[in-house]
Amino acid sequence: MLKLRQLQKEKQRQAAQAQAPAQGRSAASPAQLRVEKDLATLELPTTVTLDTKCLGSENKVYLRISPEEGVYRGGHFRFSVVFRDTYPIEPPTVKCLNTIYHPNIDYSGNICLNVLREDWSPVMDLQTVVLGLLFLFLEPNGSDPLNRQAADTMLRDPYRFETNVQATMMGGHLDGQVFDNVRH
């Protein structure tokens, strides 16, 4: 009988040791699982690159958008995309990391894009975000601006707007604001 108890205790100890490493690892959250799914199905156009080096530690990815047409052609614009624990119920937080002259992006990098606000739905994904950002560079929206000055110029004087965009993409100043060189 004593030997039977020793065998039983030994099996329990072995089972506990086998479970210990599994318990030490944290299970992926629903948000992390969804991000992994989004990345697996993501189809990036040639004008967009993705950097996932901070995905595990910060739930963040970086995008680089390089439009080949429109007034922003020739620029390279970096964005951070942060996935909170509430993703996909709530949209990711997206910031432009360059100071640029754009009606829908303010100088702090905040972005006015409906799919990142009131039009977001849990069926949307990272692909939706990428396409929305691309669309902002191809068709800036002057009727729903974060940068009212850029929007007013775009609506009143499209030629001056394009001139301002091209000048600010090379860095420098416009109306007291310093812009990043996004041409390199």
Swiss-Prot record:
Residues 30-174 form the UBC core domain. SUPFAM superfamilies: UBC-like. One of its GO terms (molecular function) is ATP binding. Residues 10-29 are annotated as: Disordered. Gene3D superfamilies: Ubiquitin Conjugating Enzyme (3.10.110.10). Its EC number is 2.3.2.34. It catalyses: [E1 NEDD8-activating enzyme]-S-[NEDD8 protein]-yl-L-cysteine + [E2 NEDD8-conjugating enzyme]-L-cysteine = [E1 NEDD8-activating enzyme]-L-cysteine + [E2 NEDD8-conjugating enzyme]-S-[NEDD8-protein]-yl-L-cysteine. The active site is at 112 (glycyl thioester intermediate). Residues 14-29 have a biased composition (Low complexity). It comes from the Eukaryota. Pathway: Protein modification; protein neddylation. InterPro entries: UBQ-conjugat_E2_core (IPR000608), UBQ-conjugating_AS (IPR023313), UBQ-conjugating_enzyme/RWD (IPR016135). Accepts the ubiquitin-like protein NEDD8/RUB1 from the UBA3-ULA1 E1 complex and catalyzes its covalent attachment to other proteins. Belongs to the ubiquitin-conjugating enzyme family. UBC12 subfamily. This is NEDD8-conjugating enzyme UBC12.
